[in-house]
Regions:
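Short amphipathic alpha-helix that is part of the acyltransferase structural core
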Residues: 1-33, 123-129, 135-174
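Intrinsically disordered, low-complexity, positively biased terminal segments
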Residues: 1-3, 11-16, 51-52, 64, ...
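A short helix-loop-beta-strand connector motif used in the catalytic cores of GNAT acetyltransferases and
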Residues: 30-32, 37-49, 55-58, 69-71, ...
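Conserved hydrophobic beta-strand within the GNAT/NAT acetyltransferase core sheet
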Residues: 72, 103-108, 245
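Conserved catalytic-core motifs of GNAT/GCN5-like acyltransferases
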Residues: 102-106, 121-135, 267-270
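Conserved active-site tyrosine of GNAT-family acetyltransferases
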Residues: 115-120, 255-259
């Protein structure tokens, strides 16, 4: 029997409906965020649509990180069409686009049973910190490092070191993504780096528009002082604005009460 739905590729005309699907789940993404994610997926992976009678009822994105790794995200099936095997069919299509690669994803509690049924295993939990940003009032850095080295704005000559550092510390081959993020930054978006006394890059962070306001991410740093300094530098003009940071749950980096005063030795944010 023919399936009542079909898989094909998302187009620019689908962005608004994708946004509506995510709004139904109370996800914060803007249409501009969807446009960016779909663009990356179509260039380096797959952007799949599920349609029934020409209507978009589901979507999902796959991103390739080099030849060995990939990730899947933004997987949604309209609530009216759930429990019909559509999510599994969509997910298998995304996996095909990442064949031969180790695949990672961030799952909601609702989606976790589906992913576990397909062989995925939980390796950690993510924690989200967000709120209206207030200037930090914490203690001075504990290490004798100058403020300029702790965090300064990215300079063109920093880019090769930033890309190498990201691949080494994050474990993903994603220079195209980072270069696209940096090239597409608006005038009020920021990238900051941290360097040591020998000029070696040992941390970076990006502040960009996302959802209800701003997100800090990616964020990587070799120590607490550098991670905190990067966040301070990136957010120094965002007082009162809505800011979000996502971190691994076992990274006690930015407590909800004062998300700018602590970070453990290796702080990572998507």
């Amino acid at each position: 029997m023919q399936e009542p739905f079909a898989l094909d590729t998302l187009t620019a005309a689908d962005i608004h409906t994708c946004w509506q699907l995510s709004q139904a789940l109370r996800w914060p993404h803007r249409e501009a965020d969807w446009q960016q994610f779909i663009s990356w997926a179509k260039a380096h992976g797959a952007a799949l649509a599920v349609r029934a009678d020409g209507q978009l009822i589901g979507c999902g994105l796959a991103w390739q990180w080099g030849d060995e790794q990939g990730s899947i995200g933004m997987v949604i099936v309209d609530n009216a069409w759930q429990r019909r095997g559509i999510g599994k069919r969509l997910f298998k299509g995304l996996l095909q686009a990442l064949e031969g690669r180790d695949v990672m994803l961030q799952a909601t509690a609702q989606g976790r049973p589906l992913y576990e049924s397909l062989g995925f295993a939980a390796i950690g939990h993510a924690r989200q910190f967000h709120g209206h940003w207030q200037p930090p009032t914490g203690a001075a850095p504990t290490a004798p490092i100058t403020t300029d080295n702790l965090a300064r704005l990215l300079q063109p000559q920093d880019l090769p070191a930033l890309l190498a550092y990201d691949q080494r510390e994050r474990g993903l081959t994603r220079p195209a993504l980072l270069q696209a993020l940096l090239a597409q930054m608006d005038a009020d978006e920021r990238c900051a780096v941290s360097v040591d006394e020998q000029g070696r890059l040992c941390g970076y962070g990006i502040l960009r528009r996302f959802g209800r306001g701003w997100v800090v991410g990616p964020l990587l740093a070799d120590g607490a002082d550098r991670a905190v300094a990067l966040v301070k530098r990136l957010t120094q003009e965002r007082t009162g604005d809505f800011v979000r940071i996502d971190l691994a749950a076992d990274t006690r980096a930015f407590p909800a009460s004062h998300p700018h005063t602590q970070a453990q030795a290796q702080a990572q944010a998507q």
